[in-house]
């Protein structure tokens, strides 16, 4: 009887051990699957491959357009062979492109190549991009990082990017936000302008209907005609370093009376009425 009891206990222990082992394997498999899924997040470029056969080429290293097969692709990586766009990838209604990457991190001559892409939601520019950026009329583009080396964006460079909510400037090389650069970016909610910028030109942020918060650059010298016209900004932040700022009577036309935050005892604090008149309400902040 004692032997039977011991034998029964042994079998039970073995069964429990096997169950625990299988459960551990299942958890391990689930963990491995989750790790694989997590490692894929934000790594779309690694999962896509450059294919030179998706393009029509002009010479050895310039892309003229997408061919029929390329137009069907939702994700495209520009091959490292390419150095420039000869024309543009759009605006053909048959172009299905939603995400665009570059195989090389080297500077790329964009020209008008990334404009009028009606369905594109995501563009990742080369890390070492320095040439001018122009993505106007990319209606579904949601965000864009401007690489640190970029020193200019085109006039009308983001015009009519109506889904654009976020622009991140990763460096401080820009001197000018040019004419109509963000005209009618109706989803843009907030922007921090690089401290290197000295001039915000005519209609730069006009008709940005969702824009609520603007952080001005330290080296700002002038704000052009209609720069923020019809943009209902609640809060503008002006760093203490700003001096001798020139503002036109219509720089903030049809915006309502926003809050203009300045640092106490700064040049703008002391000259607020001369610079802004009745354009906005003076408020104070700590400059951070």
Residue map of PLM features:
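C-terminal motif of bacterial Sec signal peptides marking the signal peptidase cleavage site
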Residues: 17-20
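Structural signature of tandem-repeat unit edges
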Residues: 52-55, 70-84, 93-109, 116-131, ...
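Bacterial signal peptide processing site
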Residues: 22-25
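Post-signal peptide N-terminal segment of mature Sec-exported envelope proteins
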Residues: 29-58
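Eukaryote-biased recognition of intrinsically disordered, low-complexity regulatory segments
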Residues: 60-71
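Secretory targeting signals
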Residues: 9-15
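N-terminal export leaders
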Residues: 3-7
């Amino acid at each position: 009887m004692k032997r039977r009891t011991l034998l029964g206990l042994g079998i039970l222990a073995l069964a429990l051990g096997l169950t625990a082992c299988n459960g551990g394997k299942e958890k391990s498999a689930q963990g491995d699957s989750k790790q694989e899924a997590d490692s894929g997040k934000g790594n779309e470029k690694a999962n896509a491959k450059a294919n030179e056969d998706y393009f029509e080429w002009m010479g050895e290293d310039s892309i003229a357009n997408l061919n029929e097969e390329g137009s069907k692709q939702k994700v495209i990586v520009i091959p490292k062979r390419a150095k420039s766009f000869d024309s543009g990838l759009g605006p053909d209604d048959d172009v299905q492109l939603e995400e665009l990457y570059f195989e090389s991190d080297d500077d790329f001559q964009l020209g008008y190549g990334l404009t009028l892409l009606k369905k594109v939601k995501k563009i990742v520019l080369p890390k070492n991009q320095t040439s001018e950026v122009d993505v106007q009329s990319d209606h579904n583009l949601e965000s864009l990082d401007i690489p640190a080396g970029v020193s200019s964006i085109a006039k009308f460079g983001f015009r009519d990017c109506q889904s654009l909510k976020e622009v991140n400037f990763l460096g401080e090389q820009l001197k000018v936000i040019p004419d109509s650069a963000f005209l009618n970016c109706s989803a843009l909610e907030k922007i921090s302008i690089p401290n290197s910028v000295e001039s915000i030109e005519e209609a730069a942020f006009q008709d940005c209907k969702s824009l609520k918060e603007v952080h001005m650059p330290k080296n700002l010298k002038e704000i052009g005609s209609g720069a923020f016209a019809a943009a209902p900004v609640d809060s503008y932040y002006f760093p203490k370093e700003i001096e001798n700022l020139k503002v036109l009577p219509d720089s903030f036309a049809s915006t309502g009376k926003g809050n203009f935050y300045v640092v106490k005892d700064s040049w703008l604090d002391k000259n607020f009425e001369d610079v802004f008149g009745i354009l906005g309400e003076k408020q104070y902040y700590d400059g951070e």
